[in-house]
């Protein structure tokens, strides 16, 4: 099992955007030390509200790569459908080259109908556009060139410069956003990123569908290393941790899931993520790992209000990781 962090970068009330991003920078540079046994850090993409103030996660990842030496850093969910695929490929290839293989491309389809319309994409062909964009990006990263001729893109063969440092391009993960994406990923043996806000039943259903699809199409997934995102807030006082998470998530849940009961959704997240006292985090996370088959755990401590408490929890978890190293 490997461990890393992910950053949603929600801008909390009373906190500036500078402070929000600075907290991410401080945490990433902290765990880049050889003292820590965290391997990765990922930046979330979100648009048009304070419920995630990074609209360009590859750019943010590039900044963090320049500050670090050890960590592999990437986008958690670069939305490839609403960006030009050649541009995504150029940025990913450049970071792979400049970081000497430390960049990771985590990508996603577009879940927001508003963003699809805003960026002038057709909602009715969402999955087809996603797949077309990926093929262009993957061709560019694995061969250095792309020459698409499909319903959405048709242009002459172009070279993507600089070509990647890594032999087959940067490591890739795709967000498990729908059954269509999960089945598509299984056919390509692409590892999934399971979303922290999905309930365990949904995550398990996606994992089963992934395995079933791979088996049906004869795809070897023995080396696939899914990753599980987990909201973490630990406190000696369980209620303090829970209230901090409720406060942190309330606006995002209202924005993203307007059709759901907000409190019910947040309570489910609290129950199934690592939220509560120091004894509360293990069983729920262990169960999610078992149900999804994940080999990587990504943690977000951003709901914790005291940065010193964050360091203390990171140190505590780091000791536990160290005790279990082979």
UniProtKB/Swiss-Prot annotation:
<dbReference type="GO" id="GO:0047646">
    <property type="term" value="F:alkanal monooxygenase (FMN-linked) activity"/>
</dbReference>
<comment type="subunit">
    <text>Heterodimer of an alpha and a beta chain.</text>
</comment>
<dbReference type="GO" id="GO:0008218">
    <property type="term" value="P:bioluminescence"/>
</dbReference>
<keyword id="KW-0285">Flavoprotein</keyword>
<dbReference type="GO" id="GO:0005829">
    <property type="term" value="C:cytosol"/>
</dbReference>
<dbReference type="InterPro" id="IPR033924">
    <property type="entry name" value="Alkanal_monooxygenase"/>
</dbReference>
<dbReference type="Pfam" id="PF00296">
    <property type="entry name" value="Bac_luciferase"/>
</dbReference>
<dbReference type="InterPro" id="IPR036661">
    <property type="entry name" value="Luciferase-like_sf"/>
</dbReference>
<dbReference type="InterPro" id="IPR002103">
    <property type="entry name" value="Luciferase_bac/NFP"/>
</dbReference>
<comment type="similarity">
    <text>Belongs to the bacterial luciferase oxidoreductase family.</text>
</comment>
<keyword id="KW-0455">Luminescence</keyword>
<dbReference type="InterPro" id="IPR011251">
    <property type="entry name" value="Luciferase-like_dom"/>
</dbReference>
<keyword id="KW-0288">FMN</keyword>
<comment type="function">
    <text>Light-emitting reaction in luminous bacteria. The specific role of the beta subunit is unknown, but it is absolutely required for bioluminescence activity.</text>
</comment>
<keyword id="KW-0560">Oxidoreductase</keyword>
<keyword id="KW-0599">Photoprotein</keyword>
<dbReference type="InterPro" id="IPR050766">
    <property type="entry name" value="Bact_Lucif_Oxidored"/>
</dbReference>
<protein>
    <recommendedName>
        <fullName>Alkanal monooxygenase beta chain</fullName>
        <ecNumber>1.14.14.3</ecNumber>
    </recommendedName>
</protein>
<keyword id="KW-0503">Monooxygenase</keyword>
<dbReference type="InterPro" id="IPR018235">
    <property type="entry name" value="Bacterial_luciferase_CS"/>
</dbReference>
